[in-house]
Amino acid sequence: MNIRVTEKTPGKDGDAGWLVLIYRVPPEPTRLRSTVWRRIKSLGAIYLQNSAAALPASASTERALRKLRREIIEMSGTAVLLSCSVLAGESDVHKAFQAARNDEYEEIVDRCEDFLQQVKKEYTANHFTYAELEENEVDLVKLRNWFAKVRERDVFDADGRQAVEKALEECEQSLEAYAARVYAEEAEGH
């Protein structure tokens, strides 16, 4: 399994190494747990077990996890950040990372399908205005940005990426066709 590394990373024998954050957050208020969970998810980390999250080691992931560790401590929690290598079960960790990214990719594909349905509704309702076009353009930009964030976290090149690329291409083509229709309708004064 190949790891895509964009920075020098610690480790031996070409192994990028791993960073593991083990933490405990006070049970109340519950928003603290949610904040930590969202931050860990946004970094692309996976949970090895409750309150133990792992990421491939890099300078940027180390900075992000150090920052999160400080925030947890400021929440009156405890946290330790470890740099380590996997002695056994590394393929399981890789699979867990790929599954997490594939889940995110699948969600983006679902949203792309929603986008295509929305454009189809515009045709059905005969809504060919610049306002509708702009709204759809904004939605497509959001999808592209979301994909870029997930792609950045996808250090093991999960298979689901190709499906998103195809779905986004379909969205772009659909929006281009819709835009052409809007311009034609506006030119005719409809």
Predicted regions located by residue number:
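Transmembrane beta-strand segments of outer-membrane beta-barrel domains in Gram-negative
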Residues: 127-140, 148
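Positively charged, polar, low-complexity stretches
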Residues: 1-120, 125, 145-148, 152, ...
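Glycine-rich, aromatic-bearing surface loops/beta-hairpins
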Residues: 140-190
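Alpha-helix boundary/N-cap detector
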Residues: 103, 107-110, 131, 138, ...
